[in-house]
Amino acid sequence: MAAKFVITNSERLRTIMAPIATGTAIEYGDLVAVSSGLIVKAAAASTAVAYCVKAHPANSGTQIQITEGNDFTLRGTMDVVFAAAYRGVEYDINDTTQTIDQGGTTTKVLKVSIAEDAGVVGSASNVLVRINKPIF
């Protein structure tokens, strides 16, 4: 399965090892959040997120490598086709698909790039975002 988000711009990616609950599976490219002090897959209600650098199969240890901060750009997919008006706007993520939720503006964990190449008008793919509210 292709990664939901891919890093496209980072001079130096800072990462940390964070605790994860046994039995939790996280795929490479997933966004993650914190629940009860442990890393979980991010959902629409997540108020801060990080990027999962490596896949973490269920029952494969108690730590996971995630990004620290937000000094990098991600490429992801929107749940609708991109429009120029989406540049610079903050959005949520969708629960099940981890796409950029154009209709969601509650937690605003992602911010669409203001660059000319932030997305292709009429296409939902390859939209550039930054984590707007990093875990740490």
Question: How would you label these PLM feature ranges?
Answer:
Residues 1-136:
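Surface-exposed, low-hydrophobicity beta-strand/loop segments enriched in small/polar/acidic residues
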